[in-house]
C-alpha cells in the first residue's frame, strides 16, 4: 500500500513559490505563454503543483494537461500563441508523433520537462517540430520532498542548484554512511526543512549524485550544485568494484 503525504496550505504555498523560483532560473520570462502539459488527476501532483508555481510568475497559462488529442493540443497552442511548454517528455513527444499530417506547430522558445530525462532522439524530434527550442529541466523534485533542485542557464544536463533553504542534502558512500568527497558519486539523502505535518528526514531518494567540484556558479547564485549520475538500482555491483551507468562506454 502506498503511504500518504499530507501538507498544509502554507507548506504547499512555499513549495509553489520555490518551484516558481526554479522555473524563473531555468528561463521562463515575463510575458511568456506557458502550456501546462503535466498530467492531472489520478492523485498525480505535478499538474497542480506547477499550476500553482506559474501563478507566481508574470506569465499567461494554458492548462492543457494530457487529456487531449494531439490535434486539439496544437490548435490551442497556436490559437493562444504558446511559446513555452511545461510537461513530461513522453507527453510532449506524443503530441508530435500523433499530430495529423500537415499540422502547424507553434514556434516554441523553451521546453521545461520533468519526470524523466530527455534523450537525444526525443530531443531532436522536439527541436525539429517546435523550431529549435531550448530544453531545460522544470526542476528536480519528488512528491515526498517537494523541490530539491533547480537549473540555471549555466547548469549542464543533470546538474542542479540545491534548494538549500528547503533541503539538506547528504551524499554518502554507496556501501556506508560516510560522506563522499566532491566529484565522487554517492547515495543521495534529503532532509526537508519545511514540512511539519509529515516530516521527511534523511530520505533515500534512490538517486546517485555527486557534488559539482567547481567555484561559485557564473549565474551568481550561492547555492551548492550537484549532478545526477543515475539510480541506485542501475548499478552493477561486483565483489571488488561498483559501476555506474556514466562509467560505462556504450
Task: List PLM regions with ranges.
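Active-site glycine/GP-rich loop and adjacent strand/helix microenvironment
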Residues: 60-250
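AMP-binding/adenylate-forming
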Residues: 10-24, 33-93
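Short, solvent-exposed loop/edge-beta patches enriched in aromatic
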Residues: 1, 27-30
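Phosphate-coordination loops involved in phosphoryl transfer and adenosine-cofactor binding
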Residues: 30-31, 108
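Conserved adenylation A10 loop of the ANL superfamily
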Residues: 1-8
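Beta-strand-connecting loops/turns
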Residues: 31-32, 183
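Alpha-helix N-cap/helix-start motif
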Residues: 5, 46-47, 181, 198
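Structural motif corresponding to the C-terminal cap of alpha-helices
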Residues: 23, 27, 96-99
